[in-house]
Amino acid sequence: MSKKLVVIKGPLLTQSGYGVHCRQVFKWLISREDFDVKCIVTPWGKCSWILDPENSIIQEIMKRTVNDENQPFDISFQVQLPNEWNPFLAKQNIGVTAAVETNTCNPDWVECCNRMDKVIVPSTFTKKVLVNTGADENNIEVIHESYPETFDLDDNIEVLEFLDEIETKKNFLILGQITGGNVFSDRKNLFNTIKAFVEAYKDNKDVGLIFKTNLGRNTKIDKTKTISLVKSLVKEAGKGVFPKVHILHGELSEKQLKYLYSHEKVSYLLTATRGEGFGLPILEAASQGLPVIATNWSGHLDFMSLGSFTKLPFKLTEIHETRVDNKIFMKETKWAEVPTGSSGYFLKKHLITMVKTRKTLKICQLK
């Protein structure tokens, strides 16, 4: 049987959201017996590379990587921003993107979408963003991302000694890369979220915060800078001895992530995000029965609406001028802003309900 020559282009070897999405698409492509799959690897901002030869998927990507784009590809899957797509890379070209986490996108992206044979997005939210800006909705398909299959295996965990060393038995979990240099430009809204937590549980020795984060890389220098930044944020919030804030930095394996989400000391996942194209960590946490407190807007509603979660109220607000780059984030576009005080209110409210049975909250076992 003659196989089709298929290429996937994107940040396949990076520790990033797009990198994870790339590898999900790659796994599906190599499962097809009728595809001869090649890889064109690109960077993703300043994110770290994953070059672990013992990881079978990483090894397979490296083995299939090519440098020459001028090959007679039959199909291309380009997991990138729309302006990075090449509509002439193959005979049939499919763009895969989470676009941008605002209510509309760069108008130039509309033409980029219309030039591709098909566009795949991870959520109805992302599709709406593109369509609201003028893209052809008939050319855009929604295919959701997925949590790791290994999460469904009961014994598939790897102990994180970090958690065993934490003295607080009730902890909120925040995951996310710090994506902006100030409180106004950080898309994940981590600055305000940490402040709300510290203020809500000031002087409370029974509750802690586990903050899994970085500034873009999993290096020692990045860790030092990250710890320094978080300490300054906590200090600005007027923290005393309590609550305890625990910083978790560096790459985690799928087994370690499962251990983190399902650990008895982790009581809630908290995100006051301003916008998500999909929100994979939210799905991962929910798949393990971890209760979620999240902004009631953007990509994660596709799956969180299938069950129940604590919805943080929001107002659509124009993005701050320090976030505007007129390439990805456009002037006068809007994202969600959780009103001051809302996060703290819900944090205090849910201290009482931390004993909820996880089994009743497993809402996202998507097949």
Specify the residue positions occupied by each region the protein language model found.
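Short hydrophobic beta-strand element within catalytic cores of glycosyltransferases
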Residues: 291-294, 310-311
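Conserved catalytic-core segment of nucleotide-activated headgroup transferases in glycan assembly
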Residues: 21-23, 28, 150-256
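Acidic donor-binding loop of glycosyltransferase active sites
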Residues: 259-277, 287-290
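Donor nucleotide-sugar binding/catalytic pocket of nucleotide-sugar-dependent glycosyltransferases
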Residues: 117-128, 136-155, 312
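Conserved donor-nucleotide binding/catalytic region of nucleotide-linked donor-dependent transferases
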Residues: 340, 348-366
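Extended catalytic core of nucleotide-activated donor transferases of GT-like folds
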Residues: 7-9, 46-131
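N-terminal pre-catalytic "stem/leader" segment of glycosyltransferase-like enzymes
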Residues: 1-72, 208
